[in-house]
UniProtKB/Swiss-Prot annotation:
GO MF: 1-(5-phosphoribosyl)-5-[(5-phosphoribosylamino)methylideneamino]imidazole-4-carboxamide isomerase activity
Keyword annotations from UniProtKB, A to Z: Amino-acid biosynthesis, Cytoplasm, Histidine biosynthesis, Isomerase
InterPro entries per the UniProt record, alphabetical: Aldolase_TIM, His_biosynth, HisA_bact_arch, Isoase_HisA-like, Isoase_HisA-like_bact, RibuloseP-bd_barrel
Similarity comment text for this entry: Belongs to the HisA/HisF family.
An annotated GO BP: L-tryptophan biosynthetic process
GO CC annotation: cytoplasm
Protein location: Cytoplasm
Full protein name: 1-(5-phosphoribosyl)-5-[(5-phosphoribosylamino)methylideneamino] imidazole-4-carboxamide isomerase
EC number: 5.3.1.16
Broad class of where this protein is predominantly found: cytoplasm
SUPFAM superfamilies to which the protein is assigned, alphabetical: Ribulose-phoshate binding barrel
Pfam families for this protein: His_biosynth
Pathway where this protein functions: Amino-acid biosynthesis; L-histidine biosynthesis; L-histidine from 5-phospho-alpha-D-ribose 1-diphosphate: step 4/9
């Protein structure tokens, strides 16, 4: 199972939010590129980079920083946040990004997801970001009545080959992942699923591996030191 460190960028800095709330940010580093190199040096197989400004604004805001991370890293970099056009997808992939993550556009413009997958299926993941089983969009600010499992099923039909599942209520809380929801998603679509939100211990990672998650995104716990990343790589990767 891939254990994927998260680097969330807001205002050019590496931050963590509590439950996706932009008013509750903690700055962990003024240097996202240096942070990326640190996680790589500990053995990360991949990096998960989120442009939080982009997620809120609907377009790539921290593009130059993201390109620098992608070009500096020797490991694959996946990027989400504000990717809502074919041009942005092309721009990121051309800049060296390995995988683009689509969120809002999956709800608001599924036809575009179909077009993106027709060209770049192996370089796409759709992020299912849920609050009480319902999908949230636009940097998790906008709540919808779209059911998380139904969205995943419809995206699979459009050619999506990989999913990320985030339980927003657990993100940044150091509580635990929503194991039941992740298990339900894996069994519903029978596709690779990467778990996110609340992953904060080795036992969480072992459980996610046991229920069949392809990977786990680790955020706040590696910045606070609650999760020893090097040990996690040694034991589970």
């Amino acid at each position: 199972m891939e254990i994927i460190p998260a680097i969330d960028i807001l205002g050019g800095r590496c931050v963590r939010l509590l439950q996706g709330d932009y008013a509750q940010e903690t700055v962990y580093s003024p240097d996202p590129v240096g942070t990326a190199m640190r996680w790589q040096s500990l053995g990360a197989p991949r990096l998960h980079v989120v442009d939080l400004d982009g997620a809120a604004d609907g377009e790539s805001v921290n593009f130059e920083l993201i390109r620098e991370i992608a070009n500096s890293a020797l490991i694959p970099v996946e990027v989400g946040g504000g990717i809502r056009s074919m041009d942005t997808v092309k721009k990121l992939l051309t800049a060296g990004v390995d995988r683009v993550i689509l969120g809002t556009v999956a709800v608001e413009n599924p036809e575009l997801v179909r077009e993106i997958c027709a060209r770049y299926a192996d370089s796409v993941a759709v992020s299912i970001d849920a609050r009480n089983g319902k999908v949230a969009t636009r940097g998790w600010v906008n709540s919808t009545e779209v059911d998380a499992l139904e969205l995943a099923r419809s995206m699979k039909k459009l050619g999506v080959k990989r999913f990320i599942y985030t339980d927003i209520s657990r993100d940044g809380t150091l509580s635990e992942p929503n194991f039941a929801a992740i298990r339900d998603l894996i069994s519903a679509i029978n596709m690779p699923v990467i778990a996110s939100g609340g992953v904060s211990s080795l036992s969480h990672l072992r459980l996610l591996k046991d229920i069949g998650a392809e990977g786990a995104i680790v955020g706040k716990a590696i910045y606070t030191g609650d999760l020893n990343l090097k040990r996690a790589f040694e034991e589970l990767s």
